Each structure stands twice: as structure tokens, then as C-alpha cells.
Amino acid sequence: MYNIKQSTDTKEAAAIEARRNREKERQNRFFNVRNRVMGVDVQALNNQVGDRKRREAAERSKEAAYGTSQVQYDVVVQMLEKEEADRTRQLAKKVQEFREQKQQLKNGREFSLWDPGQVWKGLPTYLSYSNTYPGPASLQYFSGEDLDRDTRLRMQQGQFRYNLERQQQEQQQAKVDENYTDALSNQLRLAMDAQATHLARLEESCRAAMMCAMANANKAQAAVQAGRQRCERQREQKANLAEIQHQSTSDLLTENPQVAQHPMAPYRVLPYCWKGMTPEQQAAIRKEQEVQRSKKQAHRQAEKTLDTEWKSQTMSSAQAVLELEEQERELCAVFQRGLGSFNQQLANEQKAQQDYLNSVIYTNQPTAQYHQQFNTSSR
């Protein structure tokens, strides 16, 4: 087969691409709920979103600056604490080394002066005597004798002067070191105060800038709100003027009752234009009320007559009931008298029968011996 390259029409391709773009835009409009809902001000919503993002960015920058300043403060404090700890440790180390190297007891100049065994360690005064076995008369050193007392006193006084001068020098050096330490502490405190002042000034400037930006944003929002309220007032004033014009030129304020009649249905009434009833309507209503009043009066009269009849019938019924009750009481009295006489007769007869039984039939009463003859065995 031959490979034949077909040429495409550029206009047709452009038209197809344009149709595709229009279809995409239409689908975007249809499927985007926020743009499809009627009554949404997209520009205002976008402005609000932009304001909120700027406000959040300003807050984040403020928090970041505050966090950075806090980190700097912490780093400075840690550095100062570390330097102070290193300085204290080095000073203690140097003091300990000096004591170990320079202030040993055996190396002290006064050790030989205050040594309690120095007298016994010294050599005797006379060493020329070469007798190997001297007697008691040749003793050269006795207990409690101090031959070098003057020399030792002079050396002790010299040592006292040396110690006093050295103590004075050490005190002066300690004062110099203390003054130097105080000067360094003051310089460090001044540097920290300057750093804190600088950071406070930076924070104040950031706060002032943020407040200025917030004030500008509030002013802009207030201006927008004022413009919106002004437009609303103007629109309301126009509506009020139009309403006043309509009320003054329409049939609402007229006294013609015909304006309340519906143009399409004469039997209907327009409530907002109704001015009251006509004299004919009022006369018809009064006539109807009079008819209703007469009917009501006749009905009341009939009810009154019926009530009178019911009362008379009730009274006659009550009289008949009273008579029947009287007759019933009389009959009950006669019945009670007859019943009483009958009961008396029965009582007399029963008494006579009981007397007959007791006097004639039950004359032989059983004794205890008679009852003991029964149930004498188990069979």
C-alpha cells in the first residue's frame, strides 16, 4: 500500500478546537456550584478570601518573628550560661591545680619552722668531739634546750612578714579580680539590656506595622461598607419616593368606593382599595340584622314557653312521686306489723315445742358412765 499523507483543513481544526473550548467552559459553568447559584457576588467573595489570606499571612509572619526572637533569646541565654559555667569550672580547676602544686604542706616555707620534730632532727652544737663512747659529762644537748632560738625567731618574723605581704597581695588581686568580674557582669548585663531593647523595638515596630495594616484594612472595609450603606440608603430613598408618588397618584387615597371593585370579577373586592360599604349595602345589612333579631326573639319566646311547660310537668311528677312514697311507707308499716305478729306467733310455737321436748322427751339425761362405754378398744 502506498503511504498517502492527507492534508488537514486548518479552519476546520480551529473550529473544532473552539467548539471544544466552549464546551469545556459550559461544563465548568454547569458543574461549578459556586458560580451556578444565583445571587452570589463572586468578586466580593474573592475579595473576602484575599483579605483573609493576607490577614492569615500577617499573623503567620508575626508568629514567625516572635518565634525567631524567642529562639534568639534562648540561644543567647544558653551561650551566656555556658560561658559562665565554663568560666567557673576553669577558675575552680586553676585554684585546685595551684593548691596541689604550690600549696603543699611539705613545700611550705613555714613547715621547717613549725615542725615539732625539728629540734630532734638538728645536729648537735659541737661536732669536733670524736670520742666514740662519751660519758654523761660529755652531753652536748639536753631536753628543753633551744640553742637556735634567736635564729628561729628571726626566721619566723621574716616568714610572718612574707605571709602578711602575700596575704595583702592576694587580697588586692582578689579585689582586682572582683572588680574585673563586676565590670564583665555589667557589660554583659548592658549587652543583654541593649539586645532586649533592640528586640522590643523590633517587636514594637512589627506590632505598629501590623496595627497600621489592620487599620488600613479596617478603613478599606469601612469605606466599602459605607459605600454599600450609602447605595442602600439611596435605593431605599428612591423606593420611598416612588411609593409616595404611587400612593399620591393612585386610587388608594380616593374616597370612591368603586375602585375596590375587581375589574374582572364584579362580585370580588380588592382589599387594599376598599373604602367601606355603600348606603345600599349598609341598609341591606341592617335589614338582615332586623330579620335575624326577630327570629332570635321568636326562638327565645318558644324556649321560654317550653321551659314553663317543663317546669309544670316537673312539679306534677314530683307531687305524684311524693304520693307514691307516702303509699309505700303505709304499706311498709302494715307489712312490718304483720311480720312482727307472725314472728311472735312462731316464737311462741317454738318455745312451746322446746318446753315439750325438755319436759316430756328429754327427761333421761346421759351420765359420764354412759359416754365412757364407747371407744374402749382399738377395734
From Swiss-Prot:
GO CC annotation: axonemal A tubule inner sheath; sperm flagellum
Coiled-coil region: 82-111, 216-304
Residue segments, region Disordered: 1-21
Ranges of biased composition (kind: Basic and acidic residues): 8-21
Disulfide bridge positions per record: none
Pfam entry (one): RIB43A
Keyword Nucleotide-binding: no
One of the GO BP terms on file: flagellated sperm motility
Keywords (A to Z) from UniProt: Cell projection, Cilium, Coiled coil, Cytoplasm, Cytoskeleton, Flagellum
Superkingdom of this protein's organism: Eukaryota
Chief subcellular location: cytoplasm
Cell location: Cytoplasm, Cytoskeleton, Flagellum axoneme
Similarity remark: Belongs to the RIB43A family.
Summary of subunit composition and partner proteins: Microtubule inner protein component of sperm flagellar doublet microtubules.
PANTHER family tied to this protein: RIB43A-LIKE WITH COILED-COILS PROTEIN 1, RIB43A-RELATED
Name of the protein this chain belongs to: RIB43A-like with coiled-coils protein 1
